[in-house]
């Protein structure tokens, strides 16, 4: 899958005035590309509002991060559950009208989640780093910043907001990007969940090596359709290599009940990331407990 990047409009300075030069009109070819183009502009604007040095100063006084990977490895019930705090998505619109991230996070913690995932994209998922801050203040579980990371700046945003781990999506990053961002995340004490969707992406990640936490997204981010056989097919082909590298495998998206969890567990998944199935339930805590224990 090739996702084109479209950095913010270049700027030209004439005398003391600065102008943005518009790109030629062109449309993104799928939802993921649309998100990436918007994210490039968003990050550029964020840098101007909050300089990197400001984020660095905020991070200096923070306590150490929690061990996201260890929390999954040490789960008493397998597969371990990463429960997602998610208000909306591009494909489903608003998933939960009465969205209270603190109440949801507390219910997840009480219901047996090992870690939480928090959507920080505002434009397409109605999330935000402010939501991550709220959740961090409410619970002690390790937190994943679920973001479309394109720049090291976003890693500093995640750490400053209280994240313990970050998502890196192979489809939108080059091999060089993945390696550099992994090192930058480690320097900040952040675990990395690198996400793949197809054989080519998983092959890339395994060839790079050094990713102890790998996610297989059952959702095709170009169409947002889900298929649990994605995990099964990729694990059948690459399961031995994942085991040889000691990587923990997370199956993401399209998981709605215990039978789905058992299905991906049988394929080799060590953990699952579940969002919509829980967010649509009135009693989130009971729904999660039932999902974990059947």
From Swiss-Prot:
The keyword Mitochondrion does not apply. Keywords: Amino-acid biosynthesis, Aromatic amino acid biosynthesis, Decarboxylase, Lyase, Tryptophan biosynthesis. It catalyses: 1-(2-carboxyphenylamino)-1-deoxy-D-ribulose 5-phosphate + H(+) = (1S,2R)-1-C-(indol-3-yl)glycerol 3-phosphate + CO2 + H2O. Its EC number is 4.1.1.48. PROSITE patterns: IGPS. One of its GO terms (molecular function) is phosphoribosylanthranilate isomerase activity. SUPFAM superfamilies: Ribulose-phoshate binding barrel. It comes from the Bacteria. It is an enzyme of class 4 (lyase). The keyword Kinase does not apply. This is Indole-3-glycerol phosphate synthase.
